[in-house]
């Protein structure tokens, strides 16, 4: 459902003069009217011409096109964001296909690596371990009293790039930009946070420009006590906030999620968001082929928290489609750097133990090795779906893809690792190795593949199709928790918008131009499920839709009226 046009009420603000021009949430730049310039002491501080936001956006677009590298474009857009947020979001929404890869993956990876080098202006909250005793004071320093979404990282596992220390702040900033651009959540309601617990990246520790705490990472009890202090301070300051954990290391991601998901409204996008968008993609791909996900055999390369999170959600979906839990688990095979996860493998992590295959059931496999490699698994399982979340480039080799295609006429191959440099195989290679028969979805953006004069569109399995809608649904419904069923409803809704399902051709996921429409639909489904599950107050469907409309922020300037502090 499209948002209804709503009349914007005037905004009463106490700021004036240069202070107002330095306030990104309120600054209009050359779009301040003459009346506003008189009322807010801006006469002479701006050029004479009063411009519209579209005229400003056109100038910014021309300037943007003058930059030759993606990182320079990223820096330019961040500068606009730190100067005039409304213009930033108008510009991004006007050119979302072009700019999403620049403000987020893959370019944000380089921005994180070079964070201290390209730093210009502070955004968000930096909480170092050294300042742990000032946690409440730090959060009180945030001027926004009505924060509704926080994205927090400790910078230890940034995309596939590893430990970036406080450089990881680029991820919460980019993620929240998408909450606004795709999900209509007002930037005034968002807060990026980095927990600076040190870094084990020696290159950063040796870098004279590094702006973080120069200390090895704290671990174990010290680490968990520090995170707990942060959570308790957030609950005290903003008790109804949605907290998203982002890019925490595997050893901490699942324990933190399990510890806090029933204490504060929270989720981990790397685990749950990735799982939701992947399952939505697989539901759509299965339906487009005239079947169900429960009929497919699935092999994973990568058995970390993200891979296992996806696997568990696939199992839940196939149970919804009629499989028993045992039958559902027998169709999912997890491979990591030590081979196929089996019940005979030592030192498994707790979240991996339910995803093992029984070694006794593999006695008839065609292999001479005790370690069952990805090729061994593909050769013996004959999977319909191959998913890569390894963070390592090139592991989907030609031999593996051709072996899969030998037994599956229409394989679904999803190299999901980010950024582009870490992808398990390129779409170009996968299409060629399967004679044009593979359905490919990637974690990073790729251009369409041209093979034998035919164009193959490549869907980006982008979490941005999921988390903005979840955030909007939580805010609109007032949900106190995010349940597994709410995530499943998001996946199902995403699948319903697949052009491949709706039209029999095209992408398996919607186009970016439709992402706000999809986010609104997901918000409604998530809010409705929250009400059904008792984590939100029940209302009518009309009331929920109205709440979504009311909370959907759009990049338009409002009239200002002067008031005193």
From Swiss-Prot:
Decide whether keyword Magnesium is in the record: no
- Organism encoding this protein: Shigella boydii serotype 18 (strain CDC 3083-94 / BS512)
Q: What top-level branch of life does the organism fall under?
A: Bacteria
Q: Which reaction does it catalyse?
A: (S)-malate + NAD(+) = pyruvate + CO2 + NADH; oxaloacetate + H(+) = pyruvate + CO2
Q: Where is this site: Important for activity?
A: 270
Which protein family is named in the record? Answer: Belongs to the malic enzymes family.
**Where along this sequence does the record place binding of a divalent metal cation?**
246-247, 270
This entry's Enzyme Commission designation comes to 1.1.1.38
From which residue to which does the signal peptide run?
Answer: none
SUPFAM superfamilies noted in UniProt:
Aminoacid dehydrogenase-like, N-terminal domain, NAD(P)-binding Rossmann-fold domains
**Binding residues for NAD(+):** 157, 270, 418
Instruction: Report the protein name in the record.
Output: NAD-dependent malic enzyme
In its UniProt record, a GO molecular function of this protein is: metal ion binding
Q: Does the keyword ATP-binding apply?
A: no
* Annotated keywords: Metal-binding, NAD, Oxidoreductase
Q: Quote the InterPro entries the UniProt record gives.
A: Aminoacid_DH-like_N_sf (IPR046346), Malic_enzyme_CS (IPR015884), Malic_N_dom (IPR012301), Malic_N_dom_sf (IPR037062), Malic_NAD-bd (IPR012302), Malic_OxRdtase (IPR001891), NAD(P)-bd_dom_sf (IPR036291), NAD_malic_enz_proteobac (IPR023667)
**Record's cofactor remark:** Divalent metal cations. Prefers magnesium or manganese.
The record describes its quaternary structure and partners as: Homotetramer.
> Catalytic residues per the record?
104 (proton donor), 175 (proton acceptor)
List required co-factors: Mg(2+); Mn(2+)
* GO CC annotation terms, alphabetical: cytosol
SMART domains reported in the protein's UniProt record: malic (SM01274), Malic_M (SM00919)
Q: What class of enzyme is it?
A: oxidoreductase
GO annotation, biological process: malate metabolic process
